[in-house]
């Protein structure tokens, strides 16, 4: 595209319930809503419509293999080229991709938010700023418990079982190690106002 300026890409990673969405909101406030495109990695779980529902119940959402990495990369590349995308929507009650999609317009800043945002090397190479949101494990668990029971139709028992069997071991194996790729680490999660202020200042000076 003639005269197109490639967007500034920010990766926001961290454990489930660490406060990534709060950090993303701060980025939007800093840049201005119309200037930010947000790719939520939760929407890029693989389509499982060809798998029986009972089998989908055993999906390990906390393993890298659960994601549609080629689609995520292609959508990020489209936004970097100034092309709108139709971001899929994931239905966690049905454990598969919804028939709905949301149009995401290219902005001056693109935020990739997700606990595996810094996992994929090809995605990291496209990022100008990599952020890891750190928070205590008990805080992250409580936030996840509230979210999954209130927003995703889960029972407390199923959330606890999933945390013990999948979330905690997968976090230690795959998410926590990506902290070493971060340019900025925000301790104490998304409620750390001084750290969020520093992140905002850094963004203002680099875009």
From Swiss-Prot:
Subcellular location: Cytoplasm
A GO cellular component annotation in the UniProt record: cytoplasm
Any one biological process term the GO annotation gives: CTP salvage
UniProt cross-references to Pfam families, sorted A to Z: PRK (PF00485)
Gene3D superfamilies hit by this protein: P-loop containing nucleotide triphosphate hydrolases
HAMAP family in alphabetical order: Uridine_kinase (MF_00551)
Family listed: Belongs to the uridine kinase family.
Official protein name in the record: Uridine kinase
Organism of this sequence: Deinococcus deserti (strain DSM 17065 / CIP 109153 / LMG 22923 / VCD115)
UniProt gene name: udk
């Amino acid at each position: 595209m003639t005269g197109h300026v490639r967007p500034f890409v920010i990766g926001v990673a961290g454990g489930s319930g660490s406060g990534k969405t709060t950090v993303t909101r701060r980025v939007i406030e800093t840049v201005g809503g119309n200037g930010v495109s947000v790719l939520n990695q939760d929407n890029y779980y693989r389509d499982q419509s060809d798998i029986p529902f009972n089998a989908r119940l055993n999906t390990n959402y906390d393993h890298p293999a659960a994601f549609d990495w080629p689609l995520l990369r292609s959508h990020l590349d489209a936004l970097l080229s100034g092309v709108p995308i139709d971001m899929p929507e994931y239905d966690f009650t049905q454990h598969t991709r919804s028939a709905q999609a949301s149009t995401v317009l290219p902005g001056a800043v693109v935020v990739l938010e997700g606990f595996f945002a810094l996992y994929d090397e090809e995605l990291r190479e496209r990022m100008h700023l990599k952020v890891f949101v750190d928070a205590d494990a008990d805080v992250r668990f409580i936030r996840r418990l509230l979210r999954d029971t209130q927003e995703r139709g889960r029972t407390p028992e199923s959330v606890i079982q999933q945390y013990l069997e999948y979330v905690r071991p997968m976090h230690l194996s795959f998410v926590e190690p990506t902290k070493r790729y971060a340019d900025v680490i925000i301790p104490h999660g998304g409620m750390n106002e001084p750290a969020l202020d520093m992140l905002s200042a850094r963004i203002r000076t680099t875009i």
